[in-house]
A protein has these predicted regions:
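PRPP-associated nucleotide enzymes
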Residues: 1-139
C-alpha cells in the first residue's frame, strides 16, 4: 500500500468532522490528550471545535516512544507527559485521547494502561478518537 500524504486543509476538515462525531456521540470530555506528534494538531482542532460548541476541557499533549523508524518498532511503548493529567483526573471525569492514525493500537493501549494503573479507582471514562486508520495494521 502506498503511503498517503494528507494536506493541511484536509487534516483540519477531517479533524472538525472527528470533533463533530464526538459531539454527536454525546461524549463531553473535560480532558483531552493529543498524542504527540500527529495527534497534537488534531487534538487542538477537536478541543477548539468542542469549546465553540460549549464543551470546556483541559488539554495536553503526551508523547509515546515505540517507533525507531518507519515500520520499525521497539519492544515496548514508553509514555511521557502523563503526570499532569494523572494528578487532575477523578472518576467522574471524561477523557478523550486523540491521535492521528490508529495503527496497531499499542500506543493508545499503553497510555490507557498507564492512566488506569496510576488512577486506580479514580480512573475516568476514557474514549479514543482518530480520523484515520491503517486497515492492514490494526489489531
Amino acid at each position: 500500500m502506498e503511503k498517503l500524504f494528507i494536506k493541511p486543509d484536509s487534516l483540519l476538515k477531517d479533524s472538525s468532522q472527528l470533533a463533530w462525531n464526538v459531539y454527536e456521540s454525546g461524549f463531553e470530555p473535560n480532558y483531552i490528550i493529543g498524542v504527540w506528534r500527529g495527534g497534537a494538531p488534531i487534538g487542538i482542532a477537536v478541543q477548539e471545535f468542542l469549546s465553540f460548541l460549549g464543551i470546556k476541557s483541559d488539554h495536553v499533549a503526551v508523547r509515546t516512544s515505540y517507533y525507531s523508524g518507519i515500520d520499525s518498532r521497539k519492544d515496548s511503548v514508553q509514555v511521557y507527559g502523563l503526570n499532569y493529567v494523572i494528578r487532575q483526573l477523578e472518576s467522574e471525569d471524561r477523557l478523550l485521547i486523540v491521535d492521528d492514525v490508529h495503527d496497531t493500537g499499542n500506543s493508545i493501549a499503553q497510555i490507557i494502561n498507564d492512566i488506569t494503573s496510576a488512577c486506580k479507582k479514580n480512573t475516568p471514562d476514557i474514549k479514543v478518537a482518530t480520523p484515520y486508520y491503517k486497515p492492514n495494521k490494526s489489531q
